[in-house]
């Protein structure tokens, strides 16, 4: 008997703001996991405010300012949860404050910005980065492909 492929996104909201877009984010991130051929994989998405993400940025990256998204990938690629065969990728922290301000700054919806940040964080968990022009081209290309194929356009 074939075992069922289960990918999970676990949400945790550390802010007072209700995040109406959780279901959409779960769908787009599950779509991204499927696109990357991941099986039995999970990770956490944690919504925070600018103060919280500022502290994370300062304490773990020595950068004394807020940012939009920070990821903490588990170093062991074969990390398992509770003895199961489920692989835990790590945590994605998203600043809702920053997502709102960037959506306004870039002239698109909060839904689009939050989706972009979630997918961006997902690719960081997979080891992608954008420190060089070439890395950025690859990572941002993958992100945009997921968002476009899923149906999240820039003007959403």
Where are these regions (language model features)?
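An acidic/histidine-cluster motif and surrounding catalytic segment
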Residues: 1-112, 123-156
